[in-house]
Amino acid sequence: MNTPAMNTVGWFEIYVQDMARARHFYEGVFGCELQPLGPPEVGMWSFASALGQYGCGGALVSHPTMPSGGNSTVVYFFCADCAVEEARVPKFGGTIERPKMSIGPFGHVTLARDPDGNLIGLHTPLMP
């Protein structure tokens, strides 16, 4: 594994109140299967990640001392075409804050909220 640059994100956690609802949303929008992680009393389900490759891993977390929603951090998920995932958001209980929009030479993004009110980004980078 290569040593990552110190300014890259190495892990993220999205705090949720209802894990079953959150898993349904994220697995449905992204067409993936989350994996259990850590002790059951914490309630963590992780997104797949490959160590040593571009991007980072993270997890949904349900913990009584950490409320969901209302923070100022946005996690952006890479998508081949963010309009595809954007169309799935309402089907799985989320809402669209800003539909697919250009961010110039950096591609396109959609801003959405999951069922717990967490703001997430769907990012389609421009490929050379």
Language model: regions and residue ranges:
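Active-site/binding-pocket entry motifs
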Residues: 53, 65-67
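Core segments of cupin and vicinal oxygen chelate
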Residues: 3-7, 13-55
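Structural motif
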Residues: 9, 55-58, 72-74, 107
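Short beta-strand micro-motifs in enzyme catalytic cores
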Residues: 43-45, 73-75, 106-110
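Mid-chain, well-packed structural core segment of small domains
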Residues: 68-92
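Conserved beta-strand in the GNAT
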Residues: 58-61, 120-121
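Vicinal oxygen chelate
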Residues: 1-10, 14, 35-38, 86-128
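A solvent-exposed interaction/effector surface
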Residues: 28, 64-65
